[in-house]
Curated annotation (Swiss-Prot):
It comes from Actinobacillus pleuropneumoniae serotype 7 (strain AP76). Gene3D superfamilies: 1.20.1270.10, 3.30.420.40, Actin, Chain A, domain 4, Substrate Binding Domain Of DNAk, Chain A, domain 1. One of its GO terms (biological process) is iron-sulfur cluster assembly. Keywords: ATP-binding, Chaperone, Nucleotide-binding. This is Chaperone protein HscA homolog. Chaperone involved in the maturation of iron-sulfur cluster-containing proteins. Has a low intrinsic ATPase activity which is markedly stimulated by HscB. Belongs to the heat shock protein 70 family.
């Protein structure tokens, strides 16, 4: 369904006026722009018939250049030429320096710990660099289409977290773009293939670009796209192939680059060699004083561990989707790195079928984004295409005992809103802390903290009387907002989740793997924590009752007996024997049965005091 546009009277567009919208594949290595023109989806080309725009910005003393012109400066002025900024976006400086120690840039930390790149034009954040690329693409598109853009759809890796998605939107706003939607790259590819060829069934989208890897398992049925599961690695791509090959060449030449210029030249040589080996079984290489031959077989051996790593992620995605390999009808290849013959061969063997490559893997994402942009801008009001993305990691809340209650499970279709009701743990409690978590584990300590906020103004009541409704809402861009509301007073508080930096690939992998490898231990830990919470509640209830009525209805011996059982349960609660704690709760319940009966009688006596029989009857 297209979005309706509202305008002032007399200022509405002509009923059939075509609004200009484009899809932008904002890639790690290269970017592309595509648009629907005269019913045909096309990638926009420059004057030299080139579609790929290098995702590179050069900050010179006099001017700023973007794209091919900037790329030519990479070996001449590497410290002021920013390449692969997408890898840096949404990450902390510490993370960047740990993960990418060989980058030629001079970094400093911003006030919030994010990286700033020192250039001749001042300090630049990855968001600003991305904004410069998007501004360039915007001007290029408007020049080619002959008018102002009404909106854009920008693609992002499916594994981008909230911080990385928000940073991408911030970059687009800096560039003056109207973002209709952020779209997962594999989903964009599914749109391009699904609509053009009318395929139905379960498909796998294998997306290996310059800097990121994504796998999505999708079901296509009668125009409905549903993402069954996603997986990926935010630090695996063709750039890593280049680095491995560059290191190998340097070893063969017995020469280590002495400065940033030589390092950049070596990486450029590695990239050229990789491309050549996609066409030939061997190629000549010259570096420093060394000249030799590199074979495709040698290159395959170098990259085999990385390709296997991607296939392990594919296996997990299939398991998450609940489908077997033989159920996959088609495998779509996306990203320039899928041109490597070894990658296509290994993916084909893994899924047991020849991958689809009929659409240029460099262009397929941009083409799908253009189709979606054309719909969202209102050019296809009758379109019946339905697009369903998913939440890649479960979203939950901390509960008593350090436990995690999942509100939105992993792989839930978005946009989505889910609500759950909670209550107070203590008598007279007037505030509640809401701790938002991300991950698959059962305990808070094993999940990722996304943010906290406090709901204040809860009416003081006995424990368990107040009702707080907590709502989690994920929008179409994968951004999360959380609201907590006390139902009787309607008082509420909320938070928009914008983490200060993104997940590392180790954290992403751990979150997915650990929920399976630690499932038994996690469940035992959860059951122990729940038993401790029950013990705490029982102890608090009994102590409160003793304070109110104990002295009035119990003898000294009875009082001491209950206190002894409380002390015993407190001691048991410190241990790890769940069954012993459960027995301690039962023993305390048994010891307080007489007390409970006496309290009930006392309450009845107080209620009937001073009343005549006929008043009661």
């Amino acid at each position: 369904m297209a979005l309706l546009q509202i305008a002032e009277p007399g200022q509405t567009a002509a009923p059939h006026q075509h609004r200009l919208a484009v899809g932008i594949d904002l890639g790690t290595t290269n970017s592309l722009v595509a648009s629907v023109r005269s019913g045909q989806t096309q990638v926009l080309l420059d004057d030299q018939e080139r579609a790929l725009v290098p995702s590179v910005v050069h900050y010179g003393e006099q001017q700023k250049t973007v794209g091919i012109e900037a790329f030519t400066q990479a070996s001449l002025d590497p410290q002021n030429t920013v390449i692969s900024a997408k890898r840096l976006i949404g990450r902390s400086l510490a993370d960047v320096q740990t993960r990418y120690p060989d980058l030629p840039y001079q970094f400093i930390a911003s006030d919030n710990g994010l990286p700033l790149i020192q250039t001749k034009q001042g300090n630049k954040s990855p968001v600003e660099v991305s904004a410069d690329i998007l501004s360039h693409l915007n001007r290029f598109a408007e020049q080619r289409l002959g008018g102002e853009l009404s909106g854009v759809v920008i693609t992002v890796p499916a594994y981008f977290d909230d911080a990385q998605r928000q940073s991408t939107k911030d970059a687009a706003r800096l560039a003056g773009l109207n973002v209709l939607r952020l779209l997962n790259e594999p989903t964009a590819a599914a749109i391009a293939y699904g609509l053009d060829s009318g395929q139905e069934g379960v498909i796998a989208v294998y997306d290996l670009g310059g800097g990121t890897f994504d796998i999505s398992i999708l079901r296509l049925s009668r125009g409905v796209f549903e993402v069954l599961a996603t997986g990926g690695d935010t630090a695996l791509g063709g750039d890593d192939f280049d680095h491995l090959l560059a290191d190998w060449i340097a070893q063969q030449a017995n020469y280590k680059p002495q400065n940033a210029n030589e390092q950049r030249e070596l990486l450029t040589l590695a990239t050229q060699t990789k491309v050549a080996l996609s066409q030939a079984v061997e190629t000549e290489v010259k570096f420093a004083n060394w000249q030799g031959t590199v074979s495709r077989e040698q290159f395959n051996e170098l990259i085999q561990p990385l390709v296997k790593r991607s296939l392990m992620t594919c296996r997990r995605a299939l398991k998450d989707a609940g489908v077997e390999g033989e159920e996959i009808r088609e495998v779509v290849m996306v990203g320039g790195s899928t041109r490597v013959p070894f990658v296509r061969e290994q993916v084909g063997e893994f899924f047991g079928k020849q991958p689809l490559t009929s659409i240029d893997p460099d262009k397929v994402v941009a083409l799908g984004a253009a189709i979606q942009a054309d719909i969202l801008v209102g050019n296809k009001p009758d379109s019946e295409m339905l697009l369903l993305d998913v939440v890649p990691l479960s979203l939950g809340i901390e509960t008593m005992g350090g436990l995690v209650e999942k509100i939105i499970p992993r792989n839930t279709t978005i946009p989505v809103a889910r609500a759950q009701e909670f209550t107070t743990a203590k008598d007279g409690q007037t505030a509640m802390s809401v701790h938002v978590l991300q991950g698959e584990r059962e305990l808070v300590e094993d999940c990722r903290s996304l943010g906290r906020f406090t709901l204040r103004g809860i009416p003081p009541m006995v424990a368990g009387a107040a009702t707080i409704r907590v709502t989690y809402q994920v929008d179409a861009d994968g951004l999360l907002s959380v609201t907590a509301m006390e139902k009787s007073t309607k008082v509420q508080a909320s938070i928009q989740i914008k983490p200060s930096y993104g997940l590392t690939d180790e954290e992403v992998t751990q979150m997915i793997k650990s929920s399976m490898t630690n499932a038994k231990e996690d469940m035992e830990a959860r059951q122990l924590a729940e038993q401790r919470v029950e013990a705490d509640r029982t102890i608090d209830t009994v102590i409160s009752a003793l304070q109110q009525d104990g002295a009035e209805v119990l003898s000294v011996e009875e009082f001491k007996l209950i206190e002894a059982e409380i002390a015993k349960l407190i001691q048991l609660k410190q241990g790890t024997d769940r069954q012993a704690i459960a027995q301690g709760v039962k023993d305390l319940d048994l010891a307080t049965q007489t007390f409970a009966a006496k309290r009930m009688n006392l309450s009845i006596q107080k209620a009937l005091a001073g009343k005549a029989v006929d008043e009661i009857i």
